[in-house]
Design a protein with these regions (language model features):
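Juxtamembrane/disordered regions of integral membrane proteins
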Residues: 2-122
């Protein structure tokens, strides 16, 4: 069942939807995250586009799984929590408040994607 919903077209479409919906958070949090990354690695954050594309495709695949808004929020929060709390566990200067905010955003983002997916029958 899962792979029937996760066609290549669906995954790519949802990856684009996620990127578009993620842009406001990326913009809003850019100074906060940028300053934190600079503190951690000693240089400015530089986007490497190929891994970024892989991440959004993986998120697009994950977004095919939930069947309710609550499941969507849970999966999004869990997905972002894995990233954020792994960073918090291993990076000395990763900020707990950022980890919480980004984890919450993951839940909100996946819930928004669920509604877009439902509205457009993606």
């Amino acid at each position: 069942m899962l792979f029937e919903r996760a066609t290549v077209f669906t995954v790519i479409t949802l990856a684009v939807v996620i990127l578009i919906l993620d842009l406001p958070w990326l913009f809003i949090s850019s100074k906060w995250a940028g300053d934190m990354i600079r503190d951690i690695q000693g240089s400015a954050l530089v986007l490497n586009p190929i891994p970024a594309i892989v991440v959004y495709l993986a998120l697009g695949f994950l977004a095919t799984i939930p069947t309710t808004p609550v499941e969507s929020f849970g999966l999004g929060a869990a997905t972002y929590a894995v990233y954020d709390f792994t960073n918090l566990a291993i990076l000395k200067k990763y900020q707990p408040l950022f980890a919480l905010a980004d984890t919450f955003w993951g839940g909100v983002l996946f819930t928004l994607v669920f509604y877009v997916r439902s509205f457009f029958s993606i």
